[in-house]
């Protein structure tokens, strides 16, 4: 509360000080104005204030070119408390300074130039004239005239004046102004008939911003002019406001209707739908419900979505077709007899027909009755079982061996069976080379037989397609011969055993007897001799005889030729084939058995 009282007291003190200062100013005499009506003479006016002895106040003036203050030349012409300067005391381009003073002090002082204080007198002789009325008789146009101030020498061009006209209805308080103009004739348009107007005019120097005093008011009344006016209702004004309001409402309603009618389309344009995954031929509901089995069955029924059937094994390759090679078409190879008409009739592994090209194709869906499942499913069958199945059905499934080769091998097996005694004698003559570090030259037919025994484990199961016959058969190039089997056979015959030791391991004797049984038809030139002091145990006599008989019995069955080709699994591309993968046989593990020892005498008795 104390703070509020303090602030209020300070405000009152400040207000009193300002009022006292203004009162002090009003108490002193001041120059109110100086004006020149025509730019030839000028007058200055002042106020006395509270000074009673007016006779003591004087107006002093001085031109800047002079240095002395002079008293006013005329105190009477311009009126009370004024000083008039006629043309003899007026210099337009020379500044003046005036001041109010008495004998002891100066009350007020001003400096100016004559052209700065020009305030023309008001125009005179205002008048108006009716120009025309509207067809309805509601509005009328008039023209207002006046004369320049008589004190201003406008005709000679000593001063140029601009005029401002203001008008209003009689009952109104605000004046309407027109733009200043140089002409003394101004038209007024669209004045309402039956209304009275007031008009006034004032002027100013063209280069000045201060207007002079207004002229006398001119009253305009259409009834006084003798114009017959039909009293009617108020002028019907065009309802612009209502038009704007209703127009905006109509546009809003139209926009709402358009939005409602085009709502789905606009919704798609503003918020486009998220595309759902679509597969041709598959119902999207299956994907939503998670029925993957049905989706997989549908995909499997279409060729476009069918998965590739080649295996992931590294030894399954793609074979390119070289159809345009004319040299391969004219070349006669061993596979021409292999894929002859008789052979194709008996074996139908390559007899499927391709509807697109007319050539033979082993595409899997077209051969439902073949036994490829026994050799193609490498993932479901072990390597050993698959090898057994291939060896049992290799002639029916692979279809790649010549009949004459089989007959030749069978005749060779029969010859071996009918002449055991001869084989025994040859073995007795050739049983010592493994112990004498000597090499023999093998018979080509027997070497081929031995190589065929091991060719299944070292055969490349791929073949180059050389031609497709008009009948639809696929002609394959000759496969690579088994080199590893031949090397093993030669290494077996070339094994050397030293005679430094008087004992021989029973396992070594069995190996030698097995080798001799396989090479019973090979001629031997070198002769062997053994030490008389050597001997071997008799516990292996029965085993050796049994092994010898078993090896002789198994030799014809193992002499079956192994094919160097394989069947076509699927046509992968217009120039590529996928062959069936044939599992390589897994070699049986050899276990070191404890063996007895035999002497050289017992060995001579066993060896024929």
UniProtKB/Swiss-Prot annotation:
Recorded topology in the membrane: Single-pass type I membrane protein
Motif Box 1 motif per record, residues: 270-278
Cytoplasmic side: 262-608
Reported modifications of this chain: On GH binding, proteolytically cleaved, in vitro, to produce GHBP.
Region ranges (Disordered): 413-451
Fibronectin type-III domain sequence ranges: 122-226
Domain of life of the organism encoding this protein: Eukaryota
Disulfide bonds: 34-44, 72-83, 97-111
Sequence motif: UbE motif, positions: 313-322
Tissue expression summary: Broad specificity.
Keyword annotations of the record: Cell membrane, Disulfide bond, Dwarfism, Endocytosis, Glycoprotein, Membrane, Phosphoprotein, Receptor, Secreted, Signal, Transmembrane, Transmembrane helix
Polar residues: bias regions: 413-426, 438-451
GO molecular function: cytokine binding; growth hormone receptor activity; peptide hormone binding
Location within or outside the cell: Cell membrane
Motif (WSXWS motif): 211-215
GO BP annotation list: cytokine-mediated signaling pathway; endocytosis; growth hormone receptor signaling pathway; positive regulation of cell population proliferation; positive regulation of receptor signaling pathway via JAK-STAT
Ranges in the topological domain labelled Extracellular: 17-237
Transmembrane residue ranges: 238-261
Region forming the signal peptide: 1-16
Annotated family: Belongs to the type I cytokine receptor family. Type 1 subfamily.
Function, in words: Receptor for pituitary gland growth hormone (GH1) involved in regulating postnatal body growth. On ligand binding, couples to the JAK2/STAT5 pathway.
Protein name, per record: Growth hormone receptor
Source species of the chain: Gallus gallus (Chicken)
């Amino acid at each position: 509360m104390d703070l509020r009282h303090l602030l209020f007291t300070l405000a009152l003190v400040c207000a009193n000080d300002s009022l006292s200062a203004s009162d002090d100013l009003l108490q002193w005499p001041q120059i109110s104005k100086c004006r020149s009506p025509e730019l030839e003479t000028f007058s200055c006016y002042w106020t006395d204030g509270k000074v009673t002895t007016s006779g003591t106040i004087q107006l002093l003036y001085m031109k800047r070119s002079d240095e002395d203050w002079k008293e006013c030349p005329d105190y009477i012409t311009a009126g009370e408390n004024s000083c008039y300067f006629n043309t003899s005391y007026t210099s337009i381009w020379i500044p003046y300074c005036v001041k109010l003073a008495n004998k002891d002090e100066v009350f007020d002082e001003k400096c100016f130039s004559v052209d700065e204080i020009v305030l023309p007198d008001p125009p005179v002789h205002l008048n108006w004239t009716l120009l025309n009325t509207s067809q309805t008789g509601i509005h009328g146009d008039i023209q207002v005239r006046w004369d320049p101030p008589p004190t201003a020498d406008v005709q000679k061009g000593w001063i140029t004046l601009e005029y401002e006209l203001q008008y209003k209805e009689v009952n109104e308080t605000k004046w309407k102004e027109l733009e200043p103009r140089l002409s003394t004739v101004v038209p007024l348009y669209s004045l309402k008939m039956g209304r009275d107007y007031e008009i006034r005019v004032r002027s100013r120097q063209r280069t000045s911003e201060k207007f002079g005093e207004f002229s006398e008011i001119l009253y305009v009344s259409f009834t006084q002019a003798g114009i017959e006016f039909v009293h009617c209702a108020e002028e019907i004004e065009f309802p612009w406001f209502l038009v704007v309001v209703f127009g905006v409402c109509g546009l809003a309603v139209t926009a709402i209707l358009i939005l409602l009618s085009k709502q789905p389309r606009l919704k798609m344009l503003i918020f486009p739908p998220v595309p759902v995954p679509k597969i041709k031929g598959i119902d999207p509901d299956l994907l939503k419900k998670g029925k993957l089995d049905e989706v997989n069955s549908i995909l499997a029924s279409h060729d476009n979505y069918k998965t590739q059937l080649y295996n992931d094994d590294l030894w399954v390759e793609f074979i390119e077709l070289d159809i345009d090679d004319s040299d391969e078409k004219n070349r006669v190879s061993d596979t021409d007899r292999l894929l002859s008409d008789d052979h194709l009739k008996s074996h139908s592994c390559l007899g499927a027909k391709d509807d697109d090209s007319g050539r033979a194709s082993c595409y899997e869906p077209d051969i439902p009755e073949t036994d490829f499942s026994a050799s193609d499913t490498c993932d479901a069958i072990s390597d050993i079982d698959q090898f057994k199945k291939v060896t049992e059905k290799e002639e029916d499934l692979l279809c790649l061996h010549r009949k004459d080769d089989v007959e030749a091998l069978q005749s060779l097996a029969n010859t071996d069976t009918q002449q055991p005694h001869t084989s025994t004698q040859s073995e007795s003559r050739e049983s010592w080379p493994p112990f004498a570090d000597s090499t023999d030259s093998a018979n080509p037919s027997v070497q081929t037989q031995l190589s065929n025994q091991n060719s299944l484990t070292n055969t490349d199961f791929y073949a180059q397609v050389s031609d497709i016959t008009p009948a639809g058969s696929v002609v394959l190039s000759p496969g690579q011969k088994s080199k590893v089997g031949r090397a093993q056979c030669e290494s077996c015959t070339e094994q050397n055993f030293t005679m430094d030791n008087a004992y021989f391991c029973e396992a070594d004797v069995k190996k030698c007897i097995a080798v001799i049984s396989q090479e019973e038809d090979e001629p031997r030139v070198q002769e062997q001799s053994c030490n008389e002091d050597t001997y071997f145990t008799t516990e292996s006599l029965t085993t050796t005889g049994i092994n010898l008989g078993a090896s002789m019995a198994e030799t014809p069955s193992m002499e079956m030729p192994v094919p160097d080709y394989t069947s076509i699994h699927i046509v992968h591309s217009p120039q590529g084939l996928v062959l069936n993968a044939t599992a390589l046989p897994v070699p049986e593990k050899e276990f070191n058995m404890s063996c007895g020892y035999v002497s050289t005498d017992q060995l001579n008795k066993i060896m024929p």
